[in-house]
């Protein structure tokens, strides 16, 4: 059992050192260089360097509570972020989808 702990600690340390040395972030099957952003489905990832640490930031669509007289309108899931996020349309303001010119 102690050999397993040592192996896990070694792998975690190796991963931490490798991530900083290559200056990139790993998420899912993506490799994102420091200073770059990349999208995967409706999530936007940004790999940054902060205080000599490689940091992965992710942005997703926020949950919104619906008020009376409003409805949630789904967006196209393959659209770039944040256009893939659903919108809320309210009666009296913008009940219908905005018209494109």
UniProtKB/Swiss-Prot annotation:
PTMs per UniProt: Contains 4 disulfide bonds.
Cystine pairs: none
Organism of derivation: Pandinus cavimanus
Protein name: Venom peptide Pc
Tissues in which the protein is found: Expressed by the venom gland.
Assigned keywords, A-Z: Disulfide bond, Secreted, Signal, Toxin
Gene Ontology CC annotations of this record: extracellular region
SMART domains (alphabetical): SVWC
Keyword presence, Transcription regulation: no
Location within or outside the cell: Secreted
Primary localization: secreted
Domain of life: Eukaryota
Coiled-coil parts of chain: none
GO molecular function: toxin activity
Signal peptide: 1-20
UniProt similarity note: Belongs to the scorpion La1-like peptide family.
């Amino acid at each position: 059992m102690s050999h397993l702990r040592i192996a896990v600690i070694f792998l975690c340390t190796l991963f931490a050192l490798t991530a900083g040395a290559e200056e990139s972030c790993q998420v899912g099957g993506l490799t994102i260089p420091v200073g770059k952003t990349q999208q995967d489905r409706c999530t936007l990832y940004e790999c940054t360097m902060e205080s000599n640490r490689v940091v992965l930031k992710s942005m997703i669509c926020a949950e919104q509570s619906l008020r009376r007289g409003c409805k949630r309108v789904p967006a196209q899931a393959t659209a770039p972020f944040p256009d893939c996020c659903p919108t809320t349309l309210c009666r009296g303001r913008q009940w219908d989808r905005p018209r494109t010119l």
